[in-house]
A protein has these predicted regions:
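Catalytic-core regions of core metabolic enzymes
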Residues: 1-138
Length: 139
């Protein structure tokens, strides 16, 4: 009978660790506007007691909810596990490509306007999937 280890070294982690239990999260499209998805994502993480690093990405605002923002994904430190993408669908393929370039391991897209919206949305979805595959980003 085998046992499951209670702790796992980073090199031995499941490929899904970055999505299911991230140690660090970038919020692309973070916002100081309470009506925006990027604000709600930040508030949710904070209120739920997330203990990892949160990196809000917003080139127009110096800080959101007391957390210093970064201007873009290129400014992230190495090793960020997950990106929450809170931007319009048209920007998502390029953002996923940037995640791959920066070594972000996983992404959750919090946007509509993909395959469910017709041919143009389906093309955007295909582009995002291709960018994820090329960059090794799990969606």
């Amino acid at each position: 009978m085998s046992t499951i280890p209670t702790t796992t070294a980073p090199a031995d982690r499941s490929p899904l660790h970055a999505i299911l239990a991230p140690d660090s999260i970038a919020i692309v499209g973070a916002s100081a506007d309470p009506t925006k998805r990027g604000y709600k994502a930040m508030v949710g993480l904070i209120q739920d007691g997330y203990r990892g690093h949160i990196y809000p990405i917003n080139p127009k605002t110096p800080a959101i909810l007391g957390i210093k923002t970064l201007p873009d994904l290129a400014a992230l430190p190495a090793g960020v596990d997950l990106a929450l993408v809170c931007t319009p669908a048209a920007s998502v393929p390029a953002i996923i490509a940037q995640c791959g370039e920066r070594g972000v391991r996983g992404a959750v897209i919090l946007a509509s306007g993909f395959r469910e919206s017709g041919a143009d949305g389906a093309a955007l979805e295909d582009q995002a999937l291709a960018a994820a595959q090329a960059g090794g980003v799990r969606l």
